[in-house]
From Swiss-Prot:
Organism this protein belongs to: Burkholderia cenocepacia (strain ATCC BAA-245 / DSM 16553 / LMG 16656 / NCTC 13227 / J2315 / CF5610) (Burkholderia cepacia (strain J2315))
Disruption phenotype: Grows more slowly than wild-type at 30 and 37 degrees Celsius, has defective protein secretion, swarming motility and biofilm formation. Increased susceptibility to polymyxin B and SDS but not to kanamycin or gentamycin. No change in the ability of bacteria to infect macrophages.
Cellular component GO terms, alphabetical: cytoplasm
CDD domains assigned: IMPase
Reactions mediated catalytically: a myo-inositol phosphate + H2O = myo-inositol + phosphate
Gene Ontology terms describing biological process: inositol metabolic process; phosphatidylinositol phosphate biosynthetic process; ribosome biogenesis; signal transduction; transcription antitermination
Organism lineage string: Bacteria, Pseudomonadati, Pseudomonadota, Betaproteobacteria, Burkholderiales
Name of the featured protein: Putative Nus factor SuhB
Length: 267
């Protein structure tokens, strides 16, 4: 295992221990509302602090971009992108679908990825050019080649002015185009499950970089494609993502393209 990935795994497991301990008595957790339908808990903060401490002990000069504490002001060609608890709403309701997501970006390219599911003790890892793994077993995206047969994950708009009407139209189209649409509520884990072939595809708009950085590398290392709704590979800071194996990806783009908020550079 790459040494930087090894440190990220250590950090993710530390965060997972904090999350698991807290999940034993959810009534004691302090919950704060960041904005409409968007929550943060003391557990998010404690998990994030543990991750940052672990990473900074090993790599004190690396930059940090984390969901709760924001972006560090130091300049470095290495940047850790962290979501300490993706699926906070699930967590506070006791719905066991959430994860820790950690990615390392080197000169703007994601090179290391960890997504850790503390409920199942499932550890998804990837190093650029070395494949994607689930609990040390090599994983690949699914083999289905028709969107009509695909199980597709997504995320629903949950904030005001997030385009719910447009999404409702897209939801209708995609529901008719695939065999089933699922919204578990933790994008990083959804992407990891696409990499493992448990879901055939995933799409979401209004998504943040820390929700998709690690998962996107897992998918490409597992043989899949990742891009924005236009099909362009420029997605990481565009707040929209589609991911699937190459054949299903190609069938999703004509549907998603009409709903994209990204305008190609040529336009």
């Amino acid at each position: 295992m790459h040494p930087m990935l090894n440190i990220a795994v250590k950090a993710a497991r530390r965060a997972g221990q904090i999350i698991n301990r807290a999940s034993l008595d959810l009534d004691l957790i302090e919950i704060r509302k960041k904005q409409q339908n968007d929550f943060v808990t003391e557990v998010d903060k404690a998990a994030e602090d543990a991750i940052i401490e672990t990473l900074k002990t090993a790599y004190p000069d690396h930059a940090i971009l984390a969901e709760e504490s924001g972006e560090s002001d130091n300049e470095s060609e290495f940047k850790w992108i962290i979501d300490p608890l993706d699926g906070t709403t699930n967590f506070i309701h006791g719905f066991p679908y959430y994860c820790v997501s950690i990615a390392l970006e080197h000169k703007g390219v994601v090179t290391q990825a960890v997504v850790y599911d503390p409920n199942k003790n499932d550890l998804f890892t990837a190093t650029r050019g070395r494949g994607a793994y689930l609990n040390d077993r090599r994983i690949r995206v699914g083999r289905r080649d028709r969107l009509a047969d695909a199980l597709v994950g997504t995320g629903f708009p949950f904030r005001e002015k997030d385009g719910l009407d447009a999404y409702a139209r897209l939801f209708t189209e995609m529901t008719q185009a695939c065999t089933g649409l699922r919204r578990p509520g933790a994008a990083a884990l959804d992407l990891a499950n696409v990499a493992a072939g448990r879901l055939d595809a995933f799409f979401e708009q209004g998504i943040n970089v820390w929700d998709m950085a690690a998962g996107s590398l897992l998918i490409t290392e597992a043989g899949g494609l990742v891009g924005n709704y236009t099909g362009d590979a420029d997605f990481l800071h565009r707040h929209e993502i589609v991911a699937a194996n190459p054949k299903i990806y190609a069938q999703m783009i004509p549907i998603l393209n009409r709903y994209s908020r990204v305008h190609p550079a040529a336009e």
